[in-house]
């Protein structure tokens, strides 16, 4: 803490904690200015034990102040001595008396404030040192640091706990710092500064003695600070709430004022508008009409220009798009033509290579084998076999057991039930009434419940509950709902009872077996009839070959490569046509007014015909050869057809020989070999001789 000594013009320092404190005496001189200007000051000791730096009044050692500090108010309070008068520098005694008067007034006000506050730990700051020049104050010894500075101090001027006060200043940085007399001297003497509560604590003699025993700066110890009382905390909380309310009130007040100002502006604008409308004249209306017409014409012109611009841009874009489509279409057609041309060239190359390597005959044989009836018959038998059906069931079960397939099936089934049963109970009643006349033994419970025969008990129970809710007489007001419910109940009785359900399943299996056997017999009979109607006898292999009816008219049956058109055909005409770029040759014949494909028969006969010729190369007459006659003759109408003869022999197990002359029940004629062999055994009775049946041997199809 620093204070001014009016008797001297120098800087006095009071030491605490090994340091020195500076005070100004005389006029208020800034320490920074002194540190740079007073380079030749001497060091002395004051009578009260303080160290003083005497300032020489030599003008050579003192730098004159800058006059700009006195003329420009933005530089803050003046530093150093005042501006020089006309006669030179001001008198030192007058300056000291004026400053001491100001300091006395400030110290009195501070003392009065401290007494009102009631805090005994704060002492007033006197304007002048009372112990100045008093011999009663003993001089202290040197400090413990040994730097030669005096450890004695004036307790009226400063406090040894100044370091702790500085720490308190940092702790309470939101409060006003203490004003020193050097700062008070800068305040104009015409105005009285407001008194402020001092936050620095000045210790008494007992506190100083106690603090002298321990080092306040000792490391490892906590520094004690003044604690706020509960009253101060409560007062702070109350002040905080009041301040918040005040701020909210101010904000609301200013918002209300701004709202009133805004409303006033709008009212003023409306008033101006009404006033301007009242001042309008008839000529103003004409001018307004003219102005509207001008702007309407301008807007119309702008709209017309914009429409023309948009239409032109649209047509240009559409034209570009159409051109682009044409170009893309041309490129696609070109690419397609190139692709087809490459395919044709590649196919021709492969055909030529196959002809040279001899693969053409093998390829034709492979195609004919794939289209052979033996392969189709084998595939049919494979599909009808039980292992194949079990394999298909296992595959279907595994596919349905997949998680995503099961979820999709469940969703579809739920939606179907919800849409078909819950929404349309009348249709369910009508469906059940159609089965009301069916006897209970013949009733199909699964069909009644609308589920599959492989449904589980849970699914059956769920279906029964859903249907019972819809067709029950208490729920459905249909006049015949009771009959429908009886049908449903009968089906449920069959399914719910395990014994009755087992009996029904066995009965159903027997019926299915019988129906399946009958169906197999009928299907086989139908196939035999079709085969008998669509087969041809072969004199080369003594077998039969199938023929296929073609969807062609006799008037346009034959294709001619020379004319590139279809020519008419006559009964018995036999020709050939090529397909698949000449790899496959098909043989046709006109029989019974229909065109048939007889490729199998022609292949077995090894007939070589040039395909797609203009004239018919062969003419077929279906008949039997008569010994002793040359050529072919038509069969007599008395003998039955060969196909029907073979069909009847297969059904009734009769050899085809007895039917050669048209008599189905005629006795068999002995063969040419039987006459020679029967002569030695002529004594054998007639009833013991049993004729041998000839078995018809089918030879495999050969190309």
Swiss-Prot record:
- Ranges for domain J come to 444-508
Q: Where in the sequence does UniProt note compositional bias of the Low complexity kind?
A: 17-28
Annotated S-S bridges: none
Q: Give the GO biological process terms.
A: protein transport
Q: Which residues cross the membrane?
A: 254-274, 305-325, 327-347
The source's domain of life comes to: Eukaryota
GO CC, one annotated term: endoplasmic reticulum membrane
Q: What spans are recorded as compositionally biased (Basic residues)? A: 193-202, 219-228, 691-703
Alphabetized UniProt keyword annotations = Chaperone, Endoplasmic reticulum, Membrane, Protein transport, Transmembrane, Transmembrane helix, Transport
Expression by tissue, per the entry, reads: Detected in heart, brain, lung, liver, skeletal muscle, kidney and testis.
Region annotation Disordered: where it falls in the sequence: 1-150, 164-229, 622-643, 659-703
Compositionally biased residues, Acidic residues: 89-102, 164-176
Which regions are flagged for Polar residues bias? Answer: 673-684
Q: How does it sit in the membrane?
A: Multi-pass membrane protein
Q: Where is the composition biased (Pro residues)?
A: 75-84
GO molecular function terms listed in the Swiss-Prot or TrEMBL record: dopamine receptor binding; G protein-coupled receptor binding
The protein's role, per its UniProt record: Regulates the export of target proteins, such as DRD1, from the endoplasmic reticulum to the cell surface.
What PANTHER family is this protein classified in?
DNAJ HOMOLOG SUBFAMILY C MEMBER 14
Record's protein name: DnaJ homolog subfamily C member 14
Phylogenetic classification of the source organism: Eukaryota, Metazoa, Chordata, Craniata, Vertebrata
Instruction: List the gene name.
Output: Dnajc14
